[in-house]
């Protein structure tokens, strides 16, 4: 039996309580292998957000595409998408695969 592969498209939370870090922990707990596409980096702790830096949408799109090209992704979970409205949607990227 192979391990199912999923991808999370989300922000990075330095306190690991949310964002792609939490998604990685949840996927692991459910027996899945998780890939990531980082949309932004957030400086935060519970109850405090000090800064958000978006990742260039073209780089986010490239992360999604390369994961879809090289791994048998069976599910995609989205979180904080930041400025992804300026690039193709994850659904459009899946169609172009």
Give residue spans per PLM region.
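Glycine/small-residue-rich loop that forms an oxyanion/phosphate-binding "nest" at active or ligand-binding sites
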Residues: 73-87
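Anionic group-transfer/hydrolysis microenvironments
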Residues: 10, 79-81, 91
């Amino acid at each position: 039996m192979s391990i199912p592969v999923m991808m999370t498209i989300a922000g990075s939370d330095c306190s690991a309580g949310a964002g792609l870090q939490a998604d990685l922990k949840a996927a692991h707990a459910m027996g899945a292998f998780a890939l990531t596409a980082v949309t932004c980096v957030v400086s935060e702790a519970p109850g405090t957000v000090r800064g958000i830096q978006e990742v260039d949408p073209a780089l986010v799109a490239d992360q999604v595409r390369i994961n879809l090209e090289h791994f048998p992704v069976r599910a995609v979970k989205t979180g904080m998408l930041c400025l992804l409205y300026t690039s193709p949607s994850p659904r459009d990227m899946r169609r172009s695969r």
